Amino acid sequence: MADEQEIMCKLENIKEIRNKTIQMEKIKSRLRTEFEALESEEKHLREYKQEMDLLLQEKMAHVEELRLIHADINVMENTIKQSESDLNKLLESTRRLHDEYKPLKEHVDALRMTLGLQRLPDLSQEEEKLSLDYFEKQKAEWQTEPQEPPIPESLAAAAAAAQQLQAARKQDARQTATFRQQPPPMKACLSCHQQIHRNAPICPLCKAKSRSRNPKKPKRKPDE
C-alpha cells in the first residue's frame, strides 16, 4: 500500500513537472519575442541618435541653416523620448516575466530533486540575452544622450557668424562675384512627402529610410 502511494505521488510530481515545464517554455518564448522587439527598438534608437549627431554637426557648420535644423532636432528629440519610453516599457515587461519565471523554476527544481533529477539551468546559462542583468547593462546605453555643442547665444551672434561664413566663401577662387546665399539643399520624403534635408538618411517625421528618386535605369538594347 505504501509503495502504491509513493508511486502515485511520483506520478503526480511528474505530471506537475510536465505542466510547469510547458509553462516555463511559453514564458521563455515570450521573453525571446520581447527581446527581439527590444533589440529592434534599440537599433532604431541608435539610428535616431546618429541622425541627431548629423543634425548637430550640420547646425554648427552652416549657421544660416539653424532654424530649419532646430526644427528637425526638436522632432528627433521627441522621437528619441518616445523610443526610450517604449524601451522602458519593454524592460518592465521583461522584469515581470522574470519575476513570474523564477518561482516556477524553483518549484520545478524542488520537484525534480525529489525524483533525483538535476536542477534546470538558469536563464543566464541557457542564453545570456534572456538574463535580467543583460537588460540592465543595456539600459545605461539607451539613456545616453548626445551632448549638444555650444551655439551662439543671440541672434546678433548668429548673424555675425553667418556674415563671417559668407566672407570666407567669397574669398574662395571658385566662387563667382555674384555669389548669393542658396537655401539649404532639400528633398521630398517619398513616404510622407514632407521637405527634409537632402543628406538625411532617415526622415525625422515618418522614420522612413531615404532613397534616391532617380535611380539609375538599365540601358535599353537597340531594336534588332
From Swiss-Prot:
UniProt-annotated stretches for the region Disordered: 166-185, 204-224
Keyword hit for Coiled coil: yes
Disruption phenotype annotation: Larva with TALEN-induced zc4h2 null mutations show abnormally pectoral flexed fins, outward positioning of eyes, continuous swimming movements and balance problems at 5 days post-fertilization (dpf). Also exhibited an open mouth as well as continuous jaw movements. Display a reduction in the number of V2 interneuron precursors in the hindbrain and spinal cord at 24 hours post-fertilization (hpf). Display a reduction in the number of GABAergic interneurons in the midbrain tegmentum at 35 hpf.
Biased composition (Basic residues): 208-224
GO biological process: nervous system development; neuromuscular junction development; neuromuscular process controlling balance; neuron development; neuron fate specification; positive regulation of neuron differentiation; spinal cord motor neuron differentiation; swimming behavior
PROSITE patterns named among the record's database cross-references: ZF_C4H2
KW Chloroplast (keyword) present: no
GO molecular function terms listed in the Swiss-Prot or TrEMBL record: zinc ion binding
InterPro entries for the chain: ZF_C4H2, Znf-C4H2
Gene Ontology CC: cytoplasm; nucleus; postsynaptic membrane
Coiled-coil zones: 12-97
Tree of life domain: Eukaryota
Any matching Pfam family: zf-C4H2
Keyword terms, alphabetized: Cell membrane, Coiled coil, Cytoplasm, Developmental protein, Differentiation, Membrane, Metal-binding, Nucleus, Postsynaptic cell membrane, Synapse, Zinc, Zinc-finger
Zinc finger (C4H2-type): 189-206
Protein's job: Plays a role in GABAergic and V2 interneurons differentiation. Involved in motoneuron development and in neuromuscular junction formation.
Name of the protein in its database record: Zinc finger C4H2 domain-containing protein
Annotated source species: Danio rerio
Primary gene name: zc4h2
